[in-house]
Amino acid sequence: MSLQHEKVTIAPLVLLSALDHYERTQTKENKRCVGVILGDANSSTIRVTNSFALPFEEDEKNSDVWFLDHNYIENMNEMCKKINAKEKLIGWYHSGPKLRASDLKINELFKKYTQNNPLLLIVDVKQQGVGLPTDAYVAIEQVKDDGTSTEKTFLHLPCTIEAEEAEEIGVEHLLRDVRDQAAGGLSIRLTNQLKSLKGLQSKLKDVVEYLDKVINKELPINHTILGKLQDVFNLLPNLGTPDDDEIDVENHDRINISNNLQKALTVKTNDELMVIYISNLVRSIIAFDDLIENKIQNKKIQEQRVKDKQSKVSDDSESESGDKEATAPLIQRKNKKN
């Protein structure tokens, strides 16, 4: 691979197109759907901006048996060039949810259509958990530690979702339709926090399972992955206190510095949490005071309405009695004449 790619950005249109493709071709066997992705792969960041579906068939029992229409790929690619010449064929996608045995062979086929190493994008159309429903891979030659011949394997690339302004507006409208309008801001934040914690728990579980398989020699040692995990662990703050038997004279100064850093981090965290607590408390008191004021105002308005209604009734009764008194002498005169 002449160009070293670092990450992949995916437009929401690609996810919607892949989901629509799967829904239209869904069968009882729940076979995966395959398509082509378009975009730009001439920098360290691969940008996936568009896609189109492909006719695809495969034998579930035999991974070597599959069908892909080459003429359809070429014709659709030429049509897409006429619409947007900047979008190049950079790889392919399928509905996963995991890698298949035939993916390497299909990936080799797409090399004839791409300028660089083709990108494989897996879109999980039935994702139940939290996190992005996408995984991106590029094929590389893996060098083994035992000195044997290299073999082709997939390298995972981090993914993010990025949208243009028009796409952001469309996504906001979609979210507005599916969002529960009755839910308050606090409940939405708590729900998002819960989903984030569940996602973190799932990722940590995957890390533990991977390390267990490496220890049990079910998977080969990958120094790149272990180095990434070590970098993650190094970013975590060390808030633990050393045991008494771990303290000696040589590293006593270093432990004191570590303890000071731990204390400073703890104090700063507690101060920030205290500010958040006081702010929420003040906000709640103000809201409660506004509620009381609204209750008082509503009661005054209700009392005023009752007084107005009573005064109106009394005025009507007085006017009726005045009319009766004015008409009484006339009635008496008529009676005398008769």
Curated annotation (Swiss-Prot):
<dbReference type="Pfam" id="PF01398">
    <property type="entry name" value="JAB"/>
</dbReference>
<feature type="modified residue" description="N-acetylserine">
    <location>
        <position position="2"/>
    </location>
</feature>
<dbReference type="InterPro" id="IPR000555">
    <property type="entry name" value="JAMM/MPN+_dom"/>
</dbReference>
<keyword id="KW-0597">Phosphoprotein</keyword>
<dbReference type="GO" id="GO:0008541">
    <property type="term" value="C:proteasome regulatory particle, lid subcomplex"/>
</dbReference>
<feature type="region of interest" description="Disordered">
    <location>
        <begin position="301"/>
        <end position="338"/>
    </location>
</feature>
<dbReference type="InterPro" id="IPR024969">
    <property type="entry name" value="EIF3F/CSN6-like_C"/>
</dbReference>
<dbReference type="GO" id="GO:0008237">
    <property type="term" value="F:metallopeptidase activity"/>
</dbReference>
<feature type="modified residue" description="Phosphoserine">
    <location>
        <position position="314"/>
    </location>
</feature>
<dbReference type="InterPro" id="IPR033858">
    <property type="entry name" value="MPN_RPN7_8"/>
</dbReference>
<feature type="domain" description="MPN">
    <location>
        <begin position="8"/>
        <end position="143"/>
    </location>
</feature>
<comment type="similarity">
    <text>Belongs to the peptidase M67A family.</text>
</comment>
<dbReference type="GO" id="GO:0034515">
    <property type="term" value="C:proteasome storage granule"/>
</dbReference>
<keyword id="KW-0647">Proteasome</keyword>
<dbReference type="GO" id="GO:0006511">
    <property type="term" value="P:ubiquitin-dependent protein catabolic process"/>
</dbReference>
<dbReference type="Pfam" id="PF13012">
    <property type="entry name" value="MitMem_reg"/>
</dbReference>
<feature type="modified residue" description="Phosphoserine">
    <location>
        <position position="319"/>
    </location>
</feature>
<comment type="function">
    <text>Acts as a regulatory subunit of the 26S proteasome which is involved in the ATP-dependent degradation of ubiquitinated proteins.</text>
</comment>
<dbReference type="GO" id="GO:0000502">
    <property type="term" value="C:proteasome complex"/>
</dbReference>
<protein>
    <recommendedName>
        <fullName>26S proteasome regulatory subunit RPN8</fullName>
    </recommendedName>
</protein>
<keyword id="KW-0007">Acetylation</keyword>
<feature type="modified residue" description="Phosphoserine">
    <location>
        <position position="317"/>
    </location>
</feature>
<dbReference type="InterPro" id="IPR037518">
    <property type="entry name" value="MPN"/>
</dbReference>
<dbReference type="GO" id="GO:0043161">
    <property type="term" value="P:proteasome-mediated ubiquitin-dependent protein catabolic process"/>
</dbReference>
<feature type="modified residue" description="Phosphothreonine">
    <location>
        <position position="327"/>
    </location>
</feature>
<feature type="compositionally biased region" description="Basic and acidic residues">
    <location>
        <begin position="301"/>
        <end position="326"/>
    </location>
</feature>
